[in-house]
């Protein structure tokens, strides 16, 4: 009996040792290299993030926390900014907010020596299939355009929405906090959803007005967001109907608070939501994209990677965290109508959310304050977010356009990767770069400088097209780079 127990214990111990060991006992005497990067980069060099040049550093140094806070507090003072609220009251409602914002954008434009203009993009929305529109209402976007000096026909749009709502999406008569009946309150002054984004748009318009970007930048304040992204939809369709080249839309919606509902603080990160397969992509292109594993390299996600490279640094004191989603669960934002119009759009959002402060009546329940109030804001965080957006917009607006017709030859199966592309229109290109990364990496890790050519033959068998994701990007004056473009296969006859 003792002998049986002894052998059972020994067997169990041996089994446990075998299960816990990552190396089979027969090979325990052997060793093997464990490389962190695979495939081993034998071509090119490690890719480094782009730091701001002296001019951009000067822009970042001008971003004012005081200005951002003052804008938010002023927007809060209008009580409700509901899309259906008064448009004639000089002190309360969306009309008063619109008038004040227009004046502020115009004041910025006055310092631009004629380069910046302020316009209204207005339309009337009637009741019908939208249950949040209960009577005809004029909806007005404030559109502030800073014309580019060399390639004015390429636009980059940024901004947030200045309308607001509370728990009841059709309550448009709520007064400002302080006149609130706790038992029956439906009032809000809505500060970071989305006064925080509008404040950034206005602050950057003030600063950029004194500079001359090479391409056009549009600073917006959208209305009708809370009724179904109506303002952004109208502006996106207006651009589309007029064949305007919107090269990128950067939505700023909820960028003013670093704390979560449980008090967790994350003050140095900002989320960037990036859609995968384009919403308007045709089935043939999508099939090709999926066949090469390119669903993670949509224009939106490569724009996101570009933003990470130019805006995550010690000058912004922030790290951009890409989120591979169109938006948060069950939520939407003003970048979506641009995506639906065939443009590239992404959305900045603070790292954590407190749902007691979103779309809530301003009230106290069980000793806890609800509502979107000024005291919840982290103005230092909001200011750092503004620097991230400033770095993004300036870097995009001074870079060449993305290379066009980017392809990779798949005529035959071999160890070579032959790329071709055509030059973008507009700003001159000084050269091109091929970037690559392991398929599971979120960001580009390596870069090959190929010069001012329109093709390149990569002869390295270790950096095989089956094992990495490639991108091609333009490089312009001062080292400003475009977002990378995924090469699609050409010359293949099946499975592509």
Swiss-Prot record:
Chief localization: secreted
Pfam families the record matches: Peptidase_M28
GO CC annotation, single: extracellular region
Transmembrane annotation, as ranges: none
InterPro entries assigned: FN3_dom, FN3_sf, Ig-like_fold, M28_fam, Peptidase_M28
EC assignment: 3.4.-.-
Source organism superkingdom: Eukaryota
KW Protein transport (keyword) present: no
Record's cofactor remark: Binds 2 Zn(2+) ions per subunit.
Keywords attached to this entry: Glycoprotein, Hydrolase, Metal-binding, Metalloprotease, Protease, Secreted, Signal, Zinc
Compartments where found: Secreted
Binding residues for Zn(2+) 1: 161, 181, 253
Catalytic EC class: hydrolase
UniProt-annotated binding residues for Zn(2+) 2: 181, 226
Annotated ranges, domain Fibronectin type-III: 402-496
GO MF assignments: metal ion binding; metalloexopeptidase activity
Similarity comment: family membership: Belongs to the peptidase M28 family. M28B subfamily.
Family annotation (PANTHER family): METALLOPEPTIDASE M28 FAMILY MEMBER, PEPTIDASE M28 DOMAIN-CONTAINING PROTEIN
Protein name according to UniProt: Probable zinc metalloprotease SNOG_06590
Species this chain originates from: Phaeosphaeria nodorum (strain SN15 / ATCC MYA-4574 / FGSC 10173) (Glume blotch fungus)
């Amino acid at each position: 009996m003792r002998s049986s127990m002894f052998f059972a214990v020994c067997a169990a111990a041996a089994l446990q040792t075998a299960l816990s060991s990552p190396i089979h006992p027969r090979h325990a005497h052997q060793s093997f290299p464990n490389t962190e990067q695979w495939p081993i980069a034998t071509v090119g060099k490690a890719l480094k993030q782009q730091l701001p040049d002296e001019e951009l550093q000067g822009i970042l140094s001008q971003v004012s926390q005081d200005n951002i806070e003052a804008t938010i507090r002023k927007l809060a003072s209008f009580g409700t900014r509901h899309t259906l609220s008064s448009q004639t009251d000089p002190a309360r409602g969306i009309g008063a907010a619109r008038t004040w914002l227009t004046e502020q954008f115009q004041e910025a434009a006055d310092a631009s020596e004629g380069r910046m203009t302020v316009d209204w993009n207005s339309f009337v929305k009637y009741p019908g299939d939208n249950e949040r529109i209960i009577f005809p209402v004029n909806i007005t976007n404030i559109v502030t355009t800073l014309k580019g000096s060399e390639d004015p026909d390429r636009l980059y749009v940024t901004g947030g929405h200045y309308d607001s709502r509370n728990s009841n999406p059709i309550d448009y008569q709520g007064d400002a906090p302080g006149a609130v009946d706790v038992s029956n309150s439906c009032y809000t002054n809505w500060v970071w959803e989305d006064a925080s984004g509008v404040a950034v748009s206005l602050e950057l318009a003030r600063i950029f007005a004194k500079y001359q970007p090479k391409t056009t930048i549009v600073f917006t304040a959208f209305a009708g967001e809370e009724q179904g992204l109506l303002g952004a939809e109208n502006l996106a369709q207006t651009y589309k109907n007029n064949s305007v080249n919107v090269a990128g839309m950067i939505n700023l919606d909820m960028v003013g608070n670093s704390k979560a509902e449980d008090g967790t603080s994350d003050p140095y990160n900002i989320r960037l939501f990036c859609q995968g397969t384009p919403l308007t992509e045709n089935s043939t292109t999508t099939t090709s994209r999926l066949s090469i594993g390119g669903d993670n390299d949509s224009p939106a996600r490569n724009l996101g990677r570009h933003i990470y490279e130019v805006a995550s640094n010690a000058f912004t004191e922030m790290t951009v965290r890409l989120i591979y989603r169109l938006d948060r669960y069950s939520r939407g934002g003003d970048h979506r109508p641009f995506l639906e119009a065939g443009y590239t759009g992404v959305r900045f959002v603070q790292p954590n959310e407190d749902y007691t402060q979103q779309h809530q009546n301003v009230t106290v329940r069980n000793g806890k304050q609800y509502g979107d109030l000024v005291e919840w804001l982290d103005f230092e965080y909001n200011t750092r977010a503004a620097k991230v957006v400033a770095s993004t917009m300036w870097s995009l607006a001074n870079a060449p356009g993305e290379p066009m017709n980017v392809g990779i030859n798949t005529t035959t199966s071999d160890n070579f990767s032959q790329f071709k592309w055509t030059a973008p229109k507009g700003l001159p290109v000084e050269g091109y770069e091929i970037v690559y990364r392991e398929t599971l990496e979120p960001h580009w890790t390596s870069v090959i400088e190929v010069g001012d050519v329109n093709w390149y033959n990569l002869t390295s068998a270790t950096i095989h097209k089956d094992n990495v994701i490639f991108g091609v990007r333009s490089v312009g004056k001062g080292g400003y780079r475009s977002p990378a473009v995924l090469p699609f296969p050409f010359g293949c006859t099946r499975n592509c």
